[in-house]
């Protein structure tokens, strides 16, 4: 548990109000239920384009449930239902008639534990492309290379593309999962504790990668690590008991929180 606020090793400047920037996604009055359990309670959040937004809060506060709601992954859970709007490109995607396959192509996700397919490194990245109808081998190879480069993995695997993805280290597997997601050319990347199972060196590589990827993608990351949130994010939202307590620029939230619950959490007084 932290006993002091995360250090912000940059010159503090006022972060623009997220509502003043072009939005990649937003939720309006979003509720998520697991049976009778009201897990997310009327959350309104806006995610600016090409920025990193961190979702923080104690275990069980609802941040991962909220993240999974953004590309409708909660639909796969029996007894889960959602109310309210999930806006992507200004369209509410929380509707039955929405094509979830296309939603998850546009809004990619990387999970806490690396989950490569039991296929070759090449096939892990190419698989989704083929499923979406790409047939030209040259085009597929170009997209595979481009995606592996964006995930900072190409130089490490370019001579071993035929090897099993399971032969890679944990950090390499997670970057492969990121490459697999970006190969589909999403606009938004959802990262659920992407470095929590990795060693410090691999974690540093993932964080460097996040800073690179935001030039092309909007990134929303769940993390228990407040130091990590301070390092990689532009905006931070503090969740508690299924509600957003505070949402602001990361520097402002960690150095001048406006809510006592936020202050207590980042100071290590609860959570």
Curated annotation (Swiss-Prot):
Supply the Pfam families for this chain.
ABC_tran (PF00005)
* Domain ABC transporter intervals: 25-266
Keywords (alphabetical) are: ATP-binding, Cell membrane, Membrane, Nucleotide-binding, Phosphate transport, Translocase, Transport
Membrane topology of this protein: Peripheral membrane protein
- What is one GO biological process annotated to this record? phosphate ion transmembrane transport
What does the function comment of this entry state?
Part of the ABC transporter complex PstSACB involved in phosphate import. Responsible for energy coupling to the transport system.
Q: What is this protein called?
A: Phosphate import ATP-binding protein PstB 2
